Curated annotation (Swiss-Prot):
GO terms for cellular component: cytoplasm; excinuclease repair complex. Its main location: cytoplasm. It comes from the Bacteria. Residues 1-51 have a biased composition (Low complexity). GO terms for molecular function: DNA binding; excinuclease ABC activity. Belongs to the UvrC family. PROSITE patterns: GIY_YIG (PS50164), UVR (PS50151), UVRC (PS50165). Residues 92-170 form the GIY-YIG domain. Gene3D superfamilies: 5' to 3' exonuclease, C-terminal subdomain, GIY-YIG endonuclease, UVR domain, UvrC, RNAse H endonuclease domain. The keyword Cytoplasm applies. The lineage of its organism: Bacteria, Pseudomonadati, Pseudomonadota, Alphaproteobacteria, Hyphomicrobiales. It is found in: Cytoplasm. This is UvrABC system protein C.
Amino acid sequence: MIQHPTDTPEVAADAAAEPERAAGAAGATPQPSQDAVEPAADVDAATASLAAEDDDEPVLPQVPEEAGDEVAAGPLAIGRSAIAQAVRLAPTSPGVYRMLNAASDVLYVGKAKNVKKRLASYARPTGHVVRISRMIAATVSVEIISTATETEALLLEANLIKQLRPRFNVLLRDDKSFPYILITGDHWAPQIIKHRGAQSRPGRYFGPFASVGSVNRTITALQRAFLMRSCTDAFFESRTRPCLLYQIKRCAGPCTGEIDFPGYTALVREATDFLSGRSRLVKQELAGEMEKASAELEFETAALYRDRLAALSAIQSQQGINPRTVEEADVFAIHQEGGYFCVEVFFFRTGQNWGNRAYFPRAEKTFTVEEVLAAFLAQFYDDKAPPKQILLSHRIEECELLAEALCIKSGHKVEILTPQRGEKKELVGHALTNAREALGRKLADTATQTRLLQGLVTTLKLPHTPKRIEVYDNSHIQGTNAVGAMIVAGPDGFIKNQYRKFNIRSEGITPGDDYGMMREVLERRFKRLLAPPPEAEAGKPKPDDEVPQWPDLVIIDGGRGQLNAVQEIFQALGLSTVTLMAVAKGPDRDAGRETLFMPDRLPIKLEPRDPVLYFIQRLRDEAHRFVIGSHRKLRKKDIREAGLQEIPGIGPSRKRALLHHFGTLKEIERASLGDLGKVPGISAESAKRIFDYFHPQPG
């Protein structure tokens, strides 16, 4: 954290010009994730522990340009007067202050050991950088919250910054909760599952992991190594025969007694030991068992131990760097380039590397890397448990204060270090290399996206470069499970946290009425935008205030007829500022032969290799991918609820034969056409009917 002008009188004049950064670590209770995930293609359909869940791609924030000219004297004088008024009533004790503009929007949240001195530094007529001057000029009032200690002020400050997202603070973005691996403790045969959110369920938690993908890969490998179950308790209790995971050697089958209680408990102990960092001991035990089985000529058993050892080696090879001297630490490295910042975070627990992730905090380019890193750390640990050590690439000010706040929050000692030698220094250097490369890739992608958007402006004769593009599509099978979807793109690429799906509700829509479905989706979307926000929501910050809510360009899948139908909807809603375009597939649905339709214009045909056409295809294909995925989730839900009841020509005897042969509905769904034909009593025609039911081609 930076030294503020009121803290040290000797450097008051110089420090007053320094940008004040917002920091803190808050003790807010972590909330369970509300992410909608599709159950993994596993035997137990309700098991979401290995769900194929997309991690949102982080995007570069929009960095406001620093004004080149001085701020007008009039607004500055008014702002200083408002701050001076607050100084008269401000306490000399620790606290948090909020600067507000004329609309009562919070411009800045800061904390101070002496609030009166800190505010007085803003009331001085000179010595401020342009960014601070602009903030002062916009200020009309100041709110103050007194705290008992400076540490408490630090915690409160970070919490308020995350809640209010003030314009002049450094803001942490893409702050989703991290996934953990949970070995449950409320059943005699524990599960191994993915977990996100509050750690309220009994059991052992291991993490955090940097991404859902790394957790899923690790759990799959752990199942091969330790044969632990991932199914729900309800599925476990309903089994009368082992499921497919037992057959493919990813579960020991405790549900049907294929392994006894002591044997399964030993597997759980081995898995717990491995995740706790005792991997060498576990591998030695497995190697010993393999040699013993081989010596006794039990080659099948020896092969099982060999496969389990290979699975453990696969996990460790995925982890890459596994330090010798660092047991539990988070490593942070920051890099600045082109006016943007990237913070790379590595997680090390029990001496193992559990992944890394890049963040792109929003901060004006006049901030130093030390200021951004300090603000980032405070907000990062606002709702996350800190490890015993935090290793940094750059020394931050008020390091001891942040460490004290994290100690209070976590209940254990927390060290914040900037290592200068040894293995810790190497880990920080590796993280710094990753930060540099991640920011370089992101800047290159953003530059490419900018060129494509400029090409779109030229080709479509748009009035300005679009900041928000919305693409719509719908999917159904003969009108059933109808769903519409909207994807969003902007200067930084796809904005996945803005994607939305719309379950079609209208009863009057006939099967296959694509126009009617699109009408419902667009009416619901734009009526919501046109409606005034509820009073309770009016003053709240948007989830991502850098993404405009109104689109500059709307793209739909279809031809002139679809375009005309959407035009009617827009006219009825009074929309005239949104540009509309329809993309019609070429003959035989060939990519590269699309035709673009826009209101009051002739059809547009682009060359197959035109980068703008490729960009439009990407937008359309992403909408199609998202809507098909949403449709499949709905259909899978219906299939689970209806079972085999809806398949025409499949009576009770054939249903019994199918369930007896495959064991579960999920295995029937996964079966190939040839596998279905092998079931006694199932003809080739019936097998095709069953296969087509589970594998339809959506419209």
